[in-house]
A protein has these predicted regions:
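Extended alpha-helical surfaces
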Residues: 1-280
Length: 280
């Protein structure tokens, strides 16, 4: 039976995507609330924070002295030690370190320098597959939803610039397969993916910050619908964290800086004929 968090959920602040300041952060949650959750629910919440560990692992593999994002589940010292163990051919218990990260680090260390493998894509594939097997219906659905909308947008961009679509799709879901193989205008997905038409409209927005805002609004509304009947559960707490991180990101990214960032991404897309990790 799942745990109920009546007092905790009742005390969580109301959030809006338009909030311009926060008195609470995802880092605060980790230090103040995380340990009050059940062991099984902490594992679900760990999936949220693993996104920061993913970025940290990539940084440390390239530079062991790199500054990491402290919002992750693991310290720089822990990650460096795990990388060292795997570099020497050792093994790490899945109870101690997620198996997908061990797999990724091993694959990274064994990849020839001349390889054209995009490490960010490989890591994203492993992460999504790992998260979608978590056993929680809402959390698994969230990761699949996010994977699908990211891939659909990447497919639109690839088709627009006449790039190979299949090589830019991340993951192995039915939607991924349709995007890789279908030549139909809608990839055969307009009746399969509820938000497909919304994504078509969003992809046509030329003002890049507005487009990203619309995407976050789409994600926000999806969460609201998905947890409508989950009142005091870990699902509502997980959604709270997702919303909190969204607002944090927008507060730290003002409109002018946002336009510069996204225009540089588009420019790199045109110049490199590759889809960088930031665009996914």
């Amino acid at each position: 039976m799942s745990s109920k968090y009546y007092y905790l959920v009742a005390c969580l602040p109301e959030l809006s995507l338009e909030d311009s300041k926060l008195s609470y952060t995802v880092a605060d949650f980790k230090t103040e609330i995380y340990n009050g959750l059940s062991a099984s629910d902490r594992k679900l919440i760990d999936l949220f924070y693993l996104k920061f560990d993913n970025a940290n692992v990539l940084k440390l593999l390239k530079d062991k002295e790199a500054e990491i994002d402290k919002r992750g589940n693991y310290s720089a010292e822990e990650l460096t030690e795990y990388i060292s163990i795997l570099r020497e051919g050792g093994e790490i218990s899945p109870k101690e370190f997620p198996v997908y990260l061990s797999t990724f680090i091993t694959d990274y260390l064994n990849t020839p320098a001349e390889s054209t493998v995009l490490h960010e894509d490989h890591l994203a594939t492993l992460y999504y597959e790992y998260a979608m097997k978590c056993g929680n219906k809402f959390v698994a659905a969230w990761f699949e939803f996010n994977l699908n909308i990211n891939n659909i947008l990447v497919a639109f961009t690839s088709r627009k610039f006449k790039w190979d679509i299949a090589s830019n799709i991340v993951g192995n879901t039915e939607v991924c397969e349709a995007l890789r193989t279908s030549s139909a205008r809608d990839f055969g997905l307009s009746g399969e993916v509820d938000v497909f038409e919304s994504l078509v409209k969003i992809s046509e927005i030329t003002e890049l910050v507005e487009r990203e805002k619309k995407l976050d609004a789409l994600r926000w509304n999806w969460m609201e619908d998905a947890i409508f009947f989950d009142y005091f559960t870990v699902e509502r707490i997980f959604a709270f964290l997702l919303k909190l991180e969204m607002i944090e990101r927008w507060i730290s990214l003002d409109k002018e800086r946002g336009n510069q960032l996204f225009r540089s991404i588009i420019e790199s897309l045109k110049n490199d004929v590759q889809i960088p990790a930031e665009f996914r």
